[in-house]
UniProtKB/Swiss-Prot annotation:
Active site, per annotation: C51 (cysteine persulfide intermediate)
Superkingdom: Bacteria
Gene Ontology BP term (one): sulfur compound metabolic process
Organism: Shigella dysenteriae serotype 1 (strain Sd197)
Keyword rRNA processing: no
Position of the signal peptide: none
Gene: sufE
Lineage: Bacteria, Pseudomonadati, Pseudomonadota, Gammaproteobacteria, Enterobacterales
One GO term describing the cellular component: cytoplasm
Family label: Belongs to the SufE family.
Self-association and partners: Homodimer. Interacts with SufS.
Protein's name in the database: Cysteine desulfuration protein SufE
Length: 138
């Protein structure tokens, strides 16, 4: 994974933002830190349905059984949301991802209240897809 903060630092940084404009800029910055997804990652099987923007998420399991995620979007804010989700699932095994509830983190960040309905639905679609892929590996 790129140089992204851990869960706790993400939350601290997010809460330090003075207003939602700063928070959106921070989310976009996180998306810019994601490594570039190569063309082969932008395949139909990695495409996430239910997002208005184009979203691709690639999931691999490393030799230690830990899930490694890569992703991209054609929308800057959505790419940032991908980074937020990846931070929350960082260093997890498939069963950990299946069992982990991201909603309390989103509530602490007041994230879903400030997203448009279509972005909230897209975020949910990303989480469902990651959890489904993780369930298939566990």
């Amino acid at each position: 994974m790129a140089v992204l903060p851990d869960k706790e630092k993400l939350l601290r940084n997010f809460l330090r933002c003075a207003n939602w404009e700063e928070k959106y800029l921070y989310i976009i910055e996180l998306g810019q830190r994601l490594p570039e997804l190569r063309d082969e990652g932008r395949s139909p099987q990695n495409s996430i349905q239910g997002c208005q923007s184009q979203v691709w998420i690639v999931m691999r399991q490393n030799a230690q059984g830990i899930i490694e995620l890569q992703g991209d979007s054609d929308a800057a804010i959505v790419k940032g949301l991908i980074a937020v989700v990846f931070i929350l699932y960082d260093q997890m095994m498939p069963q950990d991802i299946v069992n982990f509830d991201v909603r309390p983190w989103f509530e602490k960040m007041a994230l879903t209240q400030h997203l448009t309905p279509s972005r909230s639905q897209g975020l949910e679609a990303m989480i469902r897809a990651i959890r489904a892929k993780a369930a298939a590996l566990s």
